[in-house]
């Protein structure tokens, strides 16, 4: 790991941590908040499932627009300034959710979820910053460092949210608000990143769709983005339904589900900190690393649809998350390498918007559980990941530098 990069970009890495930490923090809270009547009678036994679905759906809807917009904005204003906007916006979102509990007003909670989604743009901006800060041959290692930080946040968020929420639902929301506000101040005082505007930015509500439309003029970015979308859709379908399987088929309690999620986080950590570097050295090319990761991850996902028992599912979950890192890091690196330096925020914004869309689709699929067993969706997740190999095969090799 590049310790100097962590030191010089400490505020940025904290922003990445808080983005994923606060995201994971909300899952146990939402389940608890909408488990029964609440919010002064606005949530009832009759509408609680609808309210819970809305609480989950608003974040990815906001993220779909916010990640693309903030990613493009970062190419115009610079990474640091846009990260300040993200953190201040996240603080405002968690402030609204905290206020909703104080006033027993569920629509304030929904507004906070939407604001948090709109401001959840630190990951693509951080990824673009890492690419700017290192040489092309070190790009994958820099992405892996961002993934390590994401993994720590992914493990800490649900655990801390569940513990604090057990005593008072307002505690984790207040913690998220305070940490995001503190990081916004840190970023405002930081000195990394661009200090001048690089190109004009014009606000347009159609911007996320226009950002996708720009792909037609940048064909090199299409293959890695298509592979990334299929890969993420398959994995997030698995992630959504494996929790249902562990609870309904294996009798896991809420605490055990939390520990299961932490185990998945350990897999991400192992993949990022220990496994990615030797695999990268072995396969060398981003395209080959991505294909290896998708083939391994997809095959393991297919096994989860079989009756392997609770212990088998735990082992498979760790291995799946290790393999996930190979494709995740290499595909992000391939996307950033497909455009020039001024458009890396744009392409990373597209990747995060794609993830938001995948989260939304995977969530909608849960409505089919009454008609189909969860194992069907686990198998479908594996098939989707394997389908991602098709576009990955068409990823272009990096262009050789022009000799003077």
Model regions and ranges:
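C-terminal transmembrane helical hairpin of 12-TM major facilitator-type secondary transporters
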Residues: 287-331
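Short amphipathic helix-loop junctions that connect adjacent transmembrane helices
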Residues: 28-49, 240-256
């Amino acid at each position: 790991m590049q310790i100097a990069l962590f030191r010089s970009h400490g505020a940025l890495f904290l922003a990445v941590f808080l983005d994923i930490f606060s995201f994971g923090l909300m899952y146990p809270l939402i389940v608890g908040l909408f488990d029964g009547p609440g919010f002064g009678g606005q949530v009832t036994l009759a509408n609680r499932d609808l309210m819970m679905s809305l609480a989950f759906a608003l974040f990815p809807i906001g993220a779909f627009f916010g990640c693309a917009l903030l990613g493009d904005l970062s190419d115009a204003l610079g990474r640091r300034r846009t990260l300040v906007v993200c953190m201040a916006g996240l603080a405002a979102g968690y402030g609204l959710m905290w206020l909703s509990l104080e006033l027993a007003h569920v629509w304030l909670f929904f507004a906070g979820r939407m604001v948090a989604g709109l401001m959840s743009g630190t990951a693509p901006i951080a990824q673009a910053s890492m690419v700017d800060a290192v040489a092309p041959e070190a790009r994958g290692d820099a992405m892996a460092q961002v993934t390590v930080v994401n993994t720590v946040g992914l493990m800490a968020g649900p655990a801390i949210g569940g513990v604090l929420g057990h005593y008072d639902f307002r505690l984790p929301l207040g913690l998220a608000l305070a940490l995001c506000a503190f990081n916004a101040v840190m970023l405002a005082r930081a000195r990394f990143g661009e200090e001048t505007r690089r190109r004009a930015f014009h606000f347009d509500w159609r911007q996320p769709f226009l950002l996708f439309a720009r792909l037609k003029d940048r064909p090199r970015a299409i293959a890695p983005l298509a592979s990334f979308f299929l890969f993420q859709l398959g994995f997030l379908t698995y992630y959504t339904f494996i929790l249902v399987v562990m609870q309904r088929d294996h009798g896991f309690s809420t605490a055990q589900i939390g520990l299961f999620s932490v185990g998945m986080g350990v897999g991400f950590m192992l993949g990022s900190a220990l496994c990615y570097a030797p695999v990268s050295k072995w396969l060398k090319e981003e395209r080959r690393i991505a294909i290896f990761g998708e083939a391994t991850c997809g095959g393991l996902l297919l096994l989860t649809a079989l009756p392997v028992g609770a212990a088998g599912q735990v082992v498979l979950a760790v291995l799946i998350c290790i393999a996930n890192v190979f494709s995740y890091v290499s595909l992000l690196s391939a996307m950033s390498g497909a455009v020039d330096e001024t458009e890396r925020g744009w392409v990373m914004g597209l990747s995060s918007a794609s993830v938001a869309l995948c989260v939304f689709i995977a969530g909608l699929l849960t409505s089919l559980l009454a008609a189909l067993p969860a194992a069907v969706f686990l198998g479908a997740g594996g098939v989707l990941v394997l389908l991602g190999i098709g576009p990955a095969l068409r990823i272009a090799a990096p262009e050789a530098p022009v000799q003077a």
